């Protein structure tokens, strides 16, 4: 049995590959996302993306911030071998919108902004508002879980090396913004 720290360090690349793949899917095949969540209206990269390039015993970190940030610098980093290590996402379903950040190394979700829950006018409304807020968090978490399950199925399939990786390389090399 692997020690937890050893397993963490050994497999943390999967989260980074997941986020890199997710960026590719968001840009190139948003219809694929709808097959995973039919109620999905859109999934977009939010106001922050972090990439890391681990080369020659060094670490280069590229952070792109801002609501209108251009992602060309991030794609250039991908061309040089970087992977996405953190990504802010905007998930829209129906008339509701969630914003949150995923860290690749742990798949930790943070900075949650959920749709507004119902207003609390009486003490009896409080329990319902708490349950509704928990439900709203759970919807986004389940969506990310489904995305990751789909990624893992692809990652261990023969399609990963023969089809997906070449498509990602083609996208990175042809990216125009």
Regions from the language model: what does each represent?
Residues 1-177:
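Intrinsically disordered, low-complexity, charge-rich terminal extensions
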